[in-house]
Amino acid sequence: MSYIDIIKNGIVKENPTFVLMLGMCPTLATTTSAMNGMSMGLATMSVLICTNFVISCLKSVTPDKVRIPVFIVVIAAFVTMLQLVIKAFLPDIDAALGLFIPLIVVNCIILGRAEAFAAKNSPVASLFDGIGIGLGFTLGLTLLGICREVLGSGSVFGFTLLPETYNILLFVLPPGAFITLGFLVAIVNKLKN
């Protein structure tokens, strides 16, 4: 499979948000706005790219018995670095995403890709898998955030599109996340078939 096919696969065929239904905790909780969704997606993508590459490089020296703990330590190291960078340079994003940045450590997308792809493929292919799955996750979260922000606040990326009288508060609350995700998954399934 070519590197472009690996990226396309992560965005379309194995989209973590709409096809694999992985990472639902940050998907539902952080997508109250397009900016939050995009920020969480980019944060997860950066960790995914780095961990896929490193885990693929370490696969030949990692004993099977300690494989999962090694994966978690590598993931935790990159998440810690990411959290420090976000706290230092992007305090607004840090305030908006809060606890969900450290929770990237236990995000099943990252551990799943480490186990399913990075541990079995070359470092370069694993890097491209991280890019593809990360882009798929980022696009999914951003789309979900855009829908929720437009319907709930009448704006997108902070720019007002609709007057306040058309806002539906439900969509910026947790039930709105489930409803929006359900409709988007249904649309994706319809388009696939």
What are these regions (language model features)?
Residues 7-18:
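N-terminal membrane topogenic signal
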